[in-house]
Regions:
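N-terminal assembly/attachment segments of tailed bacteriophage virion structural proteins
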Residues: 1-122, 131, 135, 149-166
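Extracellular/luminal recognition modules and glycoprotein regions
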Residues: 139-150
């Protein structure tokens, strides 16, 4: 597949009854998502796969859904939980692709070239690059012409104590 989108996260609002929240990007496995619920007070809680939610359509280019668990009345239902895990009113759900930084494609000398495996490895690297870019986009940066050569603060922790970061 070609990677034609840079979307790596989706968000939605809870209402206490909605249990399905879509994600619109490819993942390779159910565990390739971070699901975070932010309360109205700003507290963020990372939810656990198979405890708080399940995932649909891993491996599908167009994405799928995160399904929060709740008491469906049938313990054989994949969405069943004895306690309600659905996001409540005032809570925001963030679904973000988060791949392990590993490379599992192994090429064996003199074997036929596995084009599909190669393309999957390239897609995975592109996805990881997109995740890094998303993190960079949320960070403080200095201008390209700045002459700072170290990423560390020049003042000691003692000198920085009780100080405030400010902007003009």
């Amino acid at each position: 597949m070609t990677v034609s989108t840079i979307i790596i996260k989706n968000s939605g609002s809870g209402n206490g009854t909605q249990h399905s929240f879509p994600y619109g990007f490819k993942i390779f496995a159910d565990g390739d998502l971070d699901v975070i619920v932010r309360s109205s007070t700003g507290t963020e809680t990372v939810k656990a796969l198979n405890t708080d939610y399940v995932v649909t359509n891993a491996g599908i280019d167009t994405g799928g859904n995160v399904l929060f668990k709740f008491n469906t009345g049938s313990s054989s239902d994949a969405h069943f939980s004895s306690s309600d895990k659905r996001p409540q009113s005032g809570e925001t759900v963030l679904i973000r692709r988060s791949l392990d930084l590993t490379q599992s494609t192994d090429y064996v000398a003199n074997d036929p070239f596995a084009a599909e495996d190669h393309e999957t490895a390239l897609d995975r690297l592109t996805f990881i690059t997109q995740e890094i870019q998303e993190e960079l986009d949320r960070s403080f940066k200095v201008s390209r012409t700045n002459t700072i050569t170290t990423p560390e603060f020049t003042d000691s922790a003692t000198d920085r104590a009780s100080k405030t970061l400010g902007f003009d």
